[in-house]
Each structure stands twice: as structure tokens, then as C-alpha cells.
Amino acid sequence: MNIEDSCISCIDTDWSYQLARRMEKEKTNPVLGYRTAGSAAETATGDMLYREMKAIGLTDVTRDTFSLDGWEFEKAVLKFTDDDGQEHTFQMGGYQTNFETDGFEDYELVYLGKGIAADYEGMNVKGKLVMVEINQRDEWWISFPVYQAYLRGAAALIAVQANGYGEIAESALNAQDIAGPDFAPAFSLSQADARILKRSLRNKISACKDNTTDSEDTHNTLEQDAALLRRSSLKVSLDARSRVIPDTTAGNITGKIQGTETDSMILLSAHYDSYFDGFQDDNAAVAMILGIARSLVKGGYKPAHTLVFCAMAAEEWGIIDSKYDWSTGAYNQVFRVHPDWQGKVIADLNFELPAHAHNRQDAIRCTYEYADFIRQFTDSLTVPKEAYPDGITVLSPIETWSDDFSMAIAGIPSTVNDFSAGPFMQNYYHSQYDNQDVYQEAVYQFHHECYLKLIIAIDRLVLPPMNFSNTMNAVAESIHENALSFADPEQNVLLRNLQTITASAENIYDKICQINAEYATLSDSDARIAFRHKWEYAGLELLKTFRKAQDYLVRLNWQDEVIFPQEAASKNIRQLEKASRALSEGNITDALKALYRVDNNMYAFLFDEEVYYHFTEYILHQPKDRLMWGAGRIMHHENLYGIVQKLKQRMEEETPELDSEIRRLEAALRRQKAYYKDDIRYLNTSVNKLSAMLDNIYNNLLSF
């Protein structure tokens, strides 16, 4: 039995499963769970994981502490007595906001549809609880209706998931990062409980002597419900304790298997904070990385690189009033606690929700540069049909959903088991139904084996297996897809330079593969160490170039999607051109549809100007340390709030005069075209810098 098989034989998924269940013990809310950033429950769980790392034989086990904003959510219980005298008690979920009562306190509750600005017209909600129904996956995030309610004077907003999340059952609650201020309170209520409240509102209205509404009509749209049910209110009682704790501490728990040939490291990461029980997200992942560590130790594996196992705190949330308020623990680990990991860690294998099949086909999502190596690895796997009938694939680039993004922008090439596209997200994610009932043993076993093998495969490398041609091809494709004729000279220069650097990157990758293959032929320990030392500088330069590529090329749009620098302006130009053409033809409706897709201007249609302003400015003009991994990733913004409101007014006019609005759109279009040209020039400069770095690496590789 070879060493890999020996380690695989030591895998015990029952041990991992039981550890995942033990992580559920500590909770801030005794009924619902929650193990939140900086809370006593998170700290106690971290202490347990610290002891577990020691017990399985990891060395240098540490609690790496850092500052963050914490949250303790103890309870949110809503009581209501209906017209028949029946008392109802509803357990509500929480968000990272401040709200404390002295036992049960009485409130007036109103229902306001989707909670957009129009729903508040003619309503006085001061001091009241405002119940709304939202779809965070397909429409807007919780932060917008919450802040809208706060500005109108509401005591708190109660959000019901209409669709998008928590679809598994009408009793499902949901939790997400608030991405907003802590002084605008919010809670989560299930559809089933909301239906009881809505029925009582409907009954009150029906009881009015001048009303003929059918009290049993449950087929209304949200808009119809909002128009009807806003005419009444209910008396309810709320007992809640949700407390945000600014500037507290949390800790990432790390342990190691010491390397024998190099100071470089391979990192495995998962987060141990959670909403509700968090069995899949992310107990099963933390338990899996420790299960893999345990198997490697028991199997007697002596790695060349130091293997680091890190249970991250505060992935779900960790900073007040920031759009980029998640992945707090990971960002702090590599930028503040251990900046020395940058340039030393050759790969981060991050894990999310790994004990459930999110699709018929499994996927490893990774940075562009590692895609070829990962694909070669997955081609060697035998994937059990009972886990994934359609096998396994490789996806790029990484996304912002999880800690691997923070790792990548720090210059650490990262991967994650892909989880974001499957039905689990709509049904179970961040709800009380993410529990042991969604456990799939075959999937968990396969992931233990797959990633143990991947660790060993990476550990056998001398040089990071980076193919920068994948990155450059992706940049070129993004330009070809949306080429703009007014910038042809700049685009053509860039595309030629991309062809040059792509060829160079392919040559480098071929050489990297050759060097890694040569190392594999060495059996003498001293010869292997000497061979690694010979190529150490080249490895450092590859990681340095990767970090620069992340700095130069990775940007975000207003929906947190990973894009290249010119893509935001390119999309805006297309939409502004559509809007301008539509207005020239007097078609305000189509113009507004196009403007809806420019940057974050969908919110200009739906919410008060202060809401739009707040959630724009807190990205553009907030200290970098509060933007963390999102700092500097959005470069431009086109504020269309005024013109959107004006065009909505014009729609009410019989023969609207649109010359002024057309000129304003033309000005916006000129700005975006200038941004686009600047972005293309910036890209060209960046590609030239990266090309020079790659040329130096290639010359270094040829010099030995």
C-alpha cells in the first residue's frame, strides 16, 4: 500500500460527521442556534476546535486573534392573539442589528408589501413593526428595505422570504449578512407565520361594515396584498435581544503538519461561525479539513510543504455597515494577522457545504491560473456515480461568495468546492433546515478522498502550477465579446499585447510542468531538497506575479460579481445607448428598463434617495479597512437617480418633452466612454507590466 492509499484508508467520515454535530452545541440563541462573529458561542467552539487539532496530532496549534465587529443574537419572539382568542408565538430569525426589549413589549404591526418607497405612501409607521416580503436572490438585498423602514421611523423591519431563499418549507426562516447600519433593526419571519398575521389583517378589514372583501382570498399578488392590508394593523408583543458589539475580538484556529523540504505552505480553510445549526455551512467543512488532517497524520504522511489547517471565524459577517461585511476572518488572517503567508502559501483549498451534492456534476472552482493543473488532476479521478452521476468539472474564476476570494487577492491561489449554483441555495441555505437531514454520506466520503489526493498532488510540486495564459485569454475574450468601435485603436493595441503575453505564459507553464516532472524522478531526500532550493526564487516570483495580476485585473461590479476592469463601463455604455435610442423615439418605458441595469441604479427606481445615496457612498467613500476585500474593486459610478425620477414623472405626461433627459443621458454616455478608454489604457499598462515580470521568470527558468 502506497502512502496515499494508506492515508485514504484512515479516512473516517463518521468521525468527521460527529465533529460537525458537536459544533452545534454552542449557540447564541438557545432555540434557533446561531454561532456568530465574536460571540461567546463562536469563542467556545473555537476552543473546542483548538483542543481537537491538538488531539489529532497537529503541531503549532494557535488561536490567531483579530479585531472585528461582533454580534450576539439571543432571541426574537413575537406574540399575537387573533380575533378568536388564540395566542400565537413566533420564533424569528435575526440580522446583525441592535434591538433589545425589556421582556415582551407591545407594538403595532403593519404590512407593506415589498417595503419599497412607494409602499410607504400615505402611511405613518413611526414606532411600528413593518412586515414586508422580499426576494433577496432575484431582487434586492435585505439592507435596502431595512434602511427604508428606518428612515420612515419604523421600530424594526420584519422580513419574510417570498422566494429566492428558504423555499424548502413555509416554516423556513432565513439569515444573511445585513450589509447595512446596525441602528436599523431587522428580523426574519417565516411564510407560515406571516400568513397567520396577514389573515388576521384581512379579517379585520373584512369586518368593517363598508367592506366586502373576501376574507379567504389567499391568491392575491404581493402588490394586491400591500394595497389591501396596509389599511389595518395588528397589536403584537415582541421580546428580542440582538446586540452588535463594535471593536471586539475573534480568533482563527490553525494547526500544522510540518513540512520536510520547504518553508512554503499548503492551506486548507473553512469557517466555523454559522447561522442556525449550520451543519453544511460550514460545520461539515471544518470537520472535513480536520478529518483529512487526522487521516494524513494516522497514515504517516510526511509532507514536503507545511500543511496548514485553518478554521476561520466570522465568515458570515464581521463589520458594521459595509457592503463587504463577510469573509472577515479570512481577510484578517492573510492581510493583518499573517501577512507573511503572502508569498509562502502556494495554494488554499477552501471548503463550503461539502457533504451535499449541489448538482449532478461536482465542480472545483479555482483561479484561472490553476485551472489546467486542477483539470489534469480531476481527469485522474474516479467519481462514484452515487455521489455525482455526471462526474466532476473545473470552473473559473473564483467568486466572492466565500473565503477563497480573500485568499486570492492576497496572492494565494485558491480553490473551493463549487456550491453556489445548486438548489440547496434556494431551499436550505442559511435556514434552520441546514441540518443533519441534508447529509449525504457518499458525497462526504468522495470529498474527503478527492481533496486528500489533491493535497498530495500539490505537495509533490516544486513550482506553483500557474498558467497565466488562461487569465490573458479570459481578458481578451471579455474585450471581444463587447468590443466598442470608438475605442478600436486602444483595444487593438491591448489585444496584440495580450497575444504576446499569452504565448509567453504558455511557454512558462510548459517549463513549470517540466521542472515539476523532473522533481518527481528524484528519490534521494537531499537531492529533492537541493532541487527545491534551486527553484525557490522562481516560485516566489510566480506568486508575486499572481498577486500583481489580482491587483491589476480583478474588479467587482455592483452585484459583487468578479469582472475585469473595463467590463463595468462596457456594460453601462450598452445600456445607456439603448436608453438614449429609446428616448429619441419617445419610448420612456424601454429607456427606464435600460437604465435599471446601469451600475446600482435599480435602487433609484425603488427606494428613497437617501437609501440609494447611503448604499452608494459607503462603497465609494469609506475607509479601505472597512471595505476589506472589496476596497478599490469598484472604480466608477453613474448616478442616475435624478433622471430616473424625472422620467418616471414624464411618463404621467400626455406629450412629454424629453430633450433635457436626452442631453443628460448623452453626458452620462460621454463619461462612461471616457472611463472605458481609461480602463483599456490601464489594462494595457498592466498587461505590459505583467509581461515584463513573466519574461524575467522565463529567463530565470532557462538560466539553469
Language-model regions: role of each:
Residues 2, 10-14, 18-21, 25-126:
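Noncatalytic luminal/extracellular "stalk/propeptide" segments of secretory-pathway proteins
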Residues 3-10, 30-40, 111, 133-139, ...:
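Second-shell loop/turn segments in exported
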Residues 4, 89-122, 178-280, 290-301:
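Soluble metallo-hydrolase cores and metallopeptidase-like ectodomains found primarily
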Residues 124-125, 145-155, 172-178, 330-340, ...:
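Mature extracellular/periplasmic domains of secretome proteins
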Residues 137-144, 148, 249-252, 274-369:
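Acidic/histidine-rich catalytic neighborhood of metal-dependent amide-processing enzymes
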